[in-house]
Amino acid sequence: MKRLDRRALFASGAAAALLAATGTSLAQQPRRGGTLRLAVPRDGGLLERVARGAVYDQLTEVAPDGLLRGELATGWHSDDSARRWIVKLRQDVSFHNGLPLRASDVIASLEAHASRGDLRLEGLRALTLKDGDAIEFVLDEGNPHLPYRLADTGLVIAADGDVQASLATMTGTGLYAVERAQDGRHFRARRREQHYKDGSAGWFDALDLIVISDAAVRAEALRDGFVDVASLPTPEGLRGRGSFNYHPSEGDMALAAGQHVVMPRRISNRGSLDDHRITERWWMA
């Protein structure tokens, strides 16, 4: 499979919330447990992006090693022109309300994105159900990159296609289900007991995201142990005040985390900001 170029990710807009992949020991394996407490700024929409990433899935995803793999899709293929694609859907999936994932939910979600002029679905002519568990995509022009486009974190699949639900009412198929939330202020979610990603992702038992506008106050909250991870532009307020992991680096940081929070090891020469799925791929030491 082709690796997804980091610059392409940034150009797609997905990098705005990409939050995973830096070095830990190969021997350090993920384990379940704990609540991730994350402080984010009010500006930039990070609360919503991380929350949506926890609650929703896409058809495909970019794995930590940079390869494309299925998420709600288990496979895909196109004709020679790359104008017609067949995407086969996973069958062992249910929404947080207990209802099974249906092809109609996928079609309604993608049509909702397309109706809003989403450029990632530019050139999409039709979506139709095929054989009960697959969807046919018909494009205006051939596009061999369609499976990568479907991995974009904005193209979430929601129950009944309600892709613009408020934080409190989001109903997805992701690892975490909403417990309570208020747009622009806070978000709490709990790990689903059974999920098709069990054993490979979703290591926290619960998530607590809180908006703190002032960067100095976010740093103080991290320093004093009130949160585990804070979105920070610089390490000011942390230097000499404890031991922290700076992500992607101290000189060019987006996040700071306590030493008890483990980030996936860096693979090859990929950059650190390669995936938004902090809630899936980080864990507590």
Report the location of each language-model feature.
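Extracytoplasmic/periplasmic ligand-capture domains
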Residues: L4, Q28-Q29, P64, R90-L119, ...
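N-terminal secretory signal peptides and thylakoid transit peptides that target proteins
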Residues: M1-A16
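Short, well-ordered beta-strand elements
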Residues: G33-R42, R84-V87, I135, G174-Y176, ...
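Residue-level recognition of beta-strand termini and adjacent short loop/turns
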Residues: D80, D131-D133, D183
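C-terminal segment of N-terminal export signals and the immediately downstream linker at the start
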Residues: G23-P41, N269-S272
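N-terminal lobe/hinge region of extracytoplasmic solute-binding protein
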Residues: R37-D80, E111, T171
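A structural "hinge/loop" feature
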Residues: A39-G53, L72-A73, L99, L146-G154, ...
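Surface-exposed binding/hinge segments that line
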Residues: K88, L119-D160
